[in-house]
Every structure is written in structure tokens, then in C-alpha cells.
Design a protein with these regions (language model features):
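Hydrophobic, membrane-facing alpha-helical anchors
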Residues: 1-6, 51-66, 109-125, 145, ...
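Structural signature of hydrophobic alpha-helical transmembrane segments
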Residues: 40-54, 99-114, 158-173, 219-231, ...
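Membrane helical hairpin/interfacial module
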Residues: 35-101
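A generic transmembrane alpha-helix motif of multi-pass inner-membrane proteins
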Residues: 58, 267-307
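N-terminal signal-anchor module of multipass membrane proteins
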Residues: 1-57
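Helix-coil boundary and interhelical linker segments in multi-pass alpha-helical membrane proteins
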Residues: 28-40, 92-103, 149-161, 210-221, ...
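Juxtamembrane helix-loop boundaries in multi-pass membrane proteins
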Residues: 2-27, 64-89, 106, 122-149, ...
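Generic multipass alpha-helical transmembrane bundles of integral membrane proteins
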Residues: 108, 137-238
Length: 317
């Protein structure tokens, strides 16, 4: 194996952070649905996610010019959001294991996310074109909600609940804008097409975070979020039939974490229904189906990345 390919950070695609986010989230999903197995594999998936994220972090910390250049691009820049989101999700796990380690990482990741969001939208608005808008643009303003998961464990309940409400409001504002772009501003480029899968990520992340941070959730808002979440999840499943036919590119990693987040949100929703509407418990089976699909997607994309770094593995001797 040519291990130099893995340590040449300048060539690491930023979308590798999307796979890292999918790995970390998958550990949480398994821990929710099958705690016996989840407790065993979650630390390993979190570790693999951290290892996937590390080269991306090193790429940008060692070359600030590349960081700014990628952040200016409407596709690459938006797909850099999972870098900080992965750290925030990792802190959700670490907060229960080692709060002393988790807190400084959480605070640094929160500052990183806010900084990247400010720079990204400043660059995009200075050269704004409606055709540049992508589903991945949701990730900065709505993805910030992922900081509320560890924030609640650190005792910042007011911060977390306020952030959840704010991010949900931003989502409802951005949704018609993104849909307008997808309908009336032409087809997405081949590189940007995998971002269609991200349509399911912000709403499911909002639903999961809302149910975690509010002990007495509003049934109307919960129903609205759940309805859109299920619709968007089914939409991206239809998209998979086309996206999985595309030639493998690193940006295809964007299909992993939305499906993972959808399974987590469905578990939170069925947990809520168990208490208030037990006749909806059958949705738990749908959530388990989502977990199965997301696990398969993470494995498939992981194999693609392995072949990308070590192409000789796929060659016949």
C-alpha cells in the first residue's frame, strides 16, 4: 500500500469530512436502536470518524490560502461545513465519556463553524447567483444546531433551546429558496448532484435536536417537522437510484450523513410517540430500515475512498 497518499494532506478532498460525520453519527444510531451492539461499535466508529477528519483539518491548518480558496467555492465551501459538524457530533459522544476533553473541542468547533459560516456567506453574497445555491448551503446555518446536543450535556440548556428554535426558523426560511433554485435555475452539475441527498439532513437534524432539547415538545411543530422529514427522506431514497449510478467522486460522501441523521431522528420521533401516540410505534420499523440503508451507504462510500487512496487494491494481479 502507498501510505504516502494518505498523508499528503494537500490532496485530501474536503468532502471526506462528510464521511467522517456519517461514521460518527452511525455509531450514535446503532447505540439507539441496538444498544448492546451500539455500545461495542460506537467508540470504534467515532475513532474512525476522527481519523478521517484529521487529514482534512491538517490540510487547512497547514495551508490557509487553500482554506480560503475552497471556502469561496459554492460547492467545496458548503461541503466544508461537515468539518465542524463532525467535531460537534464527536463532542456529543465525548461529553459522556470525558467532559474535560469534550468541552474545549466543542467550544473550538463552535467558533470554527461560526467563522466558516460568516466567511462562506460573505463570499457567496459578494458574487451572488441564484444558480450557485445548493442543498448543502443548509449545512452552515442549520447544521449549527448540532452544537446543541453536547451543549445540553454541558448544562447550556437555554443556549441549546434558543439555538434550536433559531435554526428551525432559518430552515423554514431557506427551504422555499432552495426549492425555487432546484426547480427554476437549471440542473445541478455532476459534482454538485450528490448534494441533493443533503435535502434530508437539516430537517431531520432539526427534528432530532428539537425532541432532545425540549422535554415537552409542541405536537403541531413536531408533526410539521416529522412530515417534512419523512417526505425528504423518501425523496433522497429516490435520488439514490440515480446518484449511485454516477462515477465515484469524493463528493458522493455527501449521501452518507443525511441518511444516518434520518435514522436518528426517526428513533427520537418514535420515542416521543411511545409516550403520547403509541399507535404510531410502527414507524420504529421504518427507522430500523433507515439504519440499515445508512449503514450500507457508509460502507459503500468507505470502500470507494479506500479504492481512491489505494487504487491497486481493486486491480487484479
Amino acid at each position: 500500500m502507498n501510505w504516502k497518499r494518505f498523508i499528503q494532506f494537500s490532496g485530501v478532498p474536503p468532502s471526506q469530512a462528510s464521511l467522517a460525520l456519517g461514521m460518527i453519527g452511525l455509531g450514535q444510531a446503532w447505540d439507539l436502536y441496538l444498544p448492546f451492539y451500539g455500545d461495542l461499535i460506537r467508540p470504534y466508529l467515532a475513532g474512525i470518524g476522527a481519523l478521517l477528519l484529521l487529514p482534512v483539518l491538517l490540510k487547512y491548518t497547514t495551508n490557509f490560502r487553500t482554506f480560503i480558496s475552497d471556502l469561496r467555492h459554492p460547492v467545496s465551501g458548503s461541503l466544508m461545513a461537515p468539518i465542524s459538524m463532525s467535531l460537534l457530533m464527536l463532542c456529543d459522544y465525548l461529553a459522556a465519556v470525558s467532559p474535560i476533553i469534550a468541552y474545549p473541542i466543542w467550544f473550538a468547533a463552535l467558533l470554527l463553524h461560526l467563522s466558516m459560516m460568516t466567511l462562506f456567506f460573505t463570499f457567496q453574497l459578494s458574487n451572488f447567483k441564484m444558480s450557485h445555491i445548493l442543498p448543502s448551503w443548509f449545512l452552515y446555518p442549520v447544521g449549527l444546531i448540532s452544537s446543541s446536543l453536547a451543549g445540553t450535556q454541558f448544562g447550556y440548556t437555554v443556549f441549546s433551546s434558543t439555538l434550536v428554535n433559531t435554526c428551525i426558523a432559518i430552515y423554514f426560511f431557506m427551504l422555499p429558496v432552495v426549492l425555487y433554485r432546484l426547480v427554476f435555475e437549471g440542473a445541478l452539475s455532476v459534482r454538485a448532484k450528490p448534494t441533493l441527498a443533503i435535502m434530508a439532513a437539516p430537517i431531520n437534524l432539526s427534528l432530532a435536536s428539537y425532541l432532545v432539547n425540549f422535554p415537552n415538545p409542541d405536537p403541531i411543530l413536531t408533526g410539521a417537522l416529522a412530515g417534512i422529514a419523512v417526505t425528504m427522506t423518501l425523496f433522497i431514497y429516490l435520488c439514490y437510484f440515480r446518484l449511485l449510478r454516477l462515477q465515484f467522486k469524493p463528493s458522493i460522501a455527501a449521501i452518507t450523513f443525511p441518511s444516518v441523521i434520518s435514522s436518528v431522528a426517526m428513533y427520537r420521533l418514535t420515542d416521543f410517540f411511545d409516550e403520547y401516540h403509541p399507535h404510531w410505534h410502527w414507524l420504529h420499523k421504518f427507522g430500523f430500515l433507515e439504519l440499515t440503508i445508512s449503514t450500507g451507504l457508509v460502507i459503500w462510500v468507505s470502500i470507494g475512498f479506500i479504492k481512491m487512496y489505494w487504487p491497486q487494491l481493486g486491480q487484479k494481479s
